[in-house]
Amino acid sequence: MDLEHQTMETFLRWAAEIGISDSIDSSRFRDSCLGHSLSVSDFPDAGGRGLGAARELKKGELVLKVPRKALMTTESIIAKDLKLSDAVNLHNSLSSTQILSVCLLYEMSKEKKSFWYPYLFHIPRDYDLLATFGNFEKQALQVEDAVWATEKATAKCQSEWKEAGSLMKELELKPKFRSFQAWLWASATISSRTLHVPWDSAGCLCPVGDLFNYDAPGDYSNTPQGPESANNVEEAGLVVETHSERLTDGGFEEDVNAYCLYARRNYQLGEQVLLCYGTYTNLELLEHYGFMLEENSNDKVFIPLETSLFSLASSWPKDSLYIHQDGKLSFALISTLRLWLIPQSQRDKSVMRLVYAGSQISVKNEILVMKWMSEKCGSVLRDLPTSVTEDTVLLHNIDKLQDPELRLEQKETEAFGSEVRAFLDANCLWDVTVLSGKPIEFSRKTSRMLSKWRWSVQWRLSYKRTLADCISYCNEKMNNLLGTQDRLRDL
């Protein structure tokens, strides 16, 4: 039995001892909290380590119950430590998330003396959230909105770390637990792993409950993406947004004083059991959870729009003007464009009624809308440093770098603006990789940078594919409309 398997068994035994169970009958002590409904399994092509069905499961069936005493919250942590409680009470200006971050670092500093040690041992030590991106990975996103979101996330993390500094000093945490890197880890842990609880806006860390991989809302065919360290709910906390979602996913239930998680659909024996924790675009998934989906029906692509267009869109929120992942325009965007491309003198009540109903104003106007949108998307694509084809090849080359059995040819490292070479140069690996003629093993730091760089390229490729799909959609619709116009003229 390998060390990883042994430590997992120890963790599941500890979880059973504190009342966590995948069985309705949790009164009987077992060596593991799992085995009745769930089992820890490996899903190499669907998120890595996750939870599989130990039997046939029905939609809405309880699959895991975690008592309140087992949840890791600010309340449960300070209840076990008077020194921590007294210090926290003197810092009311800190947010609940900052307090939980400090509490997490405080517990980590105790190491094996912490009550939570069996659980903390299994928390990943690295994350791929936007706030953890270095300058190279940030610039690799290419799109201004994504670069700005990364800078904003990093600045927010730095500001919160500085604000919490005095509390961490009062607790006499060792320098390594007070460092920005430690804070970045704690902040990422809480952002990506916490579950919603009604009594604390920071949420809670839920042992075993964070082993589930992610399923997009209302999409049971969606396959989880990325490595285990990047997309299971170990790194992506469950957020329950509606009562109906709670019934098929999970939530804290006062009547049983426990967090209860449910099967969101029927599962066969051995099939991976997934949970949904909200509706997010791919950029939001990267920002808050450190992964994205290859196919995400909730993704949105925003492009630069004229100021005069926004003034006409006052009836809709600014973030409703977007392109769906399949290339189609959102209701608000196409409605606004229809109005914007009509001369102001023709914007009478009948036109406005058509606009707000989401109806086509005229064939001529619709052709103008499709032509303008196609040209706009083409302009955005041309302004970006690399193309869809180039990014597709680059992703393949990054995969080669990640595989110790493969080696890039020199021509591959010099292609497409030398982005691969820039990565190797940044890690002092250019000469080693190209001249040695042998595969090399990257350091942990370089491997983490490589992983984040891959997410950046994958995200920008998805962005560009959506724009390309939008061009195809608009051109096809425009051609159909022109054909209709010609047929009407011939009548």
UniProtKB/Swiss-Prot annotation:
Keywords: Methyltransferase, S-adenosyl-L-methionine, Transferase. The keyword Methyltransferase applies. GO terms for molecular function: methyltransferase activity. PROSITE patterns: SET. Its EC number is 2.1.1.-. GO terms for biological process: methylation. Belongs to the class V-like SAM-binding methyltransferase superfamily. This is Protein SET DOMAIN GROUP 40. The gene is SDG40.
